[in-house]
């Protein structure tokens, strides 16, 4: 994996930096693990925009990734190939099990073709292996961590991310996330050893607006450039300041204002990611 700066043959390519991985599979993905993905462009079933700045982009299939990894315990497997996934920042690995089944998993850092991977409580503590947290030594770097047992991985799934198992107390373990938050999870939740691969993803430079449009992301218009009917910052003769503290289009403060309302799981957060 390497960062490659393109030749400045145009203004768009002048500042472009790509992440190149020659080990990625260059052919088609594994067809039985593909699903159609219909474009919603940020709209709900009423046609109303629920997520702004979405639309367009290249068509692609969804790759069915196994985030649970709980029904192949004890069955040997090996990485058959590494693949690009347009649906996420991390790469994925096609794993072939001894019983002949193939599945996609998130490719861990350092994964190579032919590497053995294992699932279950007896799996060795090695990158790419998936175990219950009760069987993982304290201090181990982990990724693809479950929040609820059996629900599938929800924490530390994007490129270059990881978490650290800090402690185990009774039926709960404490995990420190990349954001600095320390969270309690049940010891029966599963996690994968190591970090997520493609760690240079954050160093890429997209280079031009069109490449962002290929990804299905539309432009973000500033509130002060809108009319008063469209945004609290809008209006005014000529170029004017917002005239108030920054807010969202719906009037919610947008600089550091906390909007978390899920009191049911607040007790599971040992240390917040905020410093104050």
Swiss-Prot record:
Statement: the UniProt record of this protein carries the keyword Transcription regulation: no
Instruction: State where composition is biased (Basic residues).
Output: 50-59
> Which GO molecular function annotations are given, in alphabetical order?
rRNA binding; structural constituent of ribosome; transferase activity
Which Gene Ontology cellular-component terms appear in the entry? large ribosomal subunit
Keyword check for RNA-binding: yes
- Region of interest (Disordered), residue spans: 37-59, 224-276
Q: Which UniProt keywords apply?
A: Ribonucleoprotein, Ribosomal protein, RNA-binding, rRNA-binding
Q: Which GO terms describe its biological process?
A: cytoplasmic translation
Q: Which InterPro entries match?
A: NA-bd_OB-fold, Rib_uL2_dom2, Ribosomal_uL2, Ribosomal_uL2_bac/org-type, Ribosomal_uL2_C, Ribosomal_uL2_CS, Ribosomal_uL2_dom3, Ribosomal_uL2_RNA-bd_dom
Kindly give the Pfam families that the UniProt entry links to this protein.
Ribosomal_L2, Ribosomal_L2_C
Q: What does this protein do?
A: One of the primary rRNA binding proteins. Required for association of the 30S and 50S subunits to form the 70S ribosome, for tRNA binding and peptide bond formation. It has been suggested to have peptidyltransferase activity; this is somewhat controversial. Makes several contacts with the 16S rRNA in the 70S ribosome.
- Subunit comment for this entry? Part of the 50S ribosomal subunit. Forms a bridge to the 30S subunit in the 70S ribosome.
Q: Which family does it belong to?
A: Belongs to the universal ribosomal protein uL2 family.
Q: What is this protein called?
A: Large ribosomal subunit protein uL2
Lineage runs:
Bacteria, Pseudomonadati, Pseudomonadota, Betaproteobacteria, Burkholderiales
């Amino acid at each position: 994996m390497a960062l490659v700066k393109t030749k400045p043959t145009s203004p768009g390519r002048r500042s472009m930096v790509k992440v190149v991985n020659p080990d990625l599979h260059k052919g088609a993905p594994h067809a039985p693990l593909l699903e159609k993905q219909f474009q919603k462009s940020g709209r709900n079933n009423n046609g109303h925009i629920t997520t702004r700045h979405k639309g367009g982009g290249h068509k692609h299939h969804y790759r069915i990734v196994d985030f649970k990894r709980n029904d192949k315990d004890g069955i040997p497997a090996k990485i058959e190939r590494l693949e690009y996934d347009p649906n996420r920042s991390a790469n994925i690995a096609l794993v072939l099990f001894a019983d002949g089944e193939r599945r996609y998993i998130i490719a861990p850092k350092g994964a190579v073709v032919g590497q053995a991977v294992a699932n279950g409580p007896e799996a060795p503590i090695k990158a790419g292996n998936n175990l219950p947290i009760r069987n993982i030594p304290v201090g181990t770097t982990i990724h693809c961590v479950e929040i609820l047992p059996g629900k599938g991985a929800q924490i530390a799934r994007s490129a270059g991310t990881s978490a650290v198992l800090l402690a185990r107390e009774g039926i709960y373990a404490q995990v420190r996330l990349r954001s600095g938050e320390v969270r309690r999870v049940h010891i029966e939740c599963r996690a994968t050893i190591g970090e997520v691969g493609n760690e240079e993803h954050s160093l890429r430079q997209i280079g031009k607006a069109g490449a962002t449009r290929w990804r299905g992301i539309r432009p973000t218009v500033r509130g002060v450039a809108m009319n008063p009917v469209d945004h609290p910052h809008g209006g005014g003769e000529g170029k004017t300041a917002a005239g108030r503290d920054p807010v969202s289009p719906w009037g919610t403060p947008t600089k550091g204002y906390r909007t978390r309302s899920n009191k049911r799981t607040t007790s599971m957060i040992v240390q917040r990611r905020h410093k104050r």
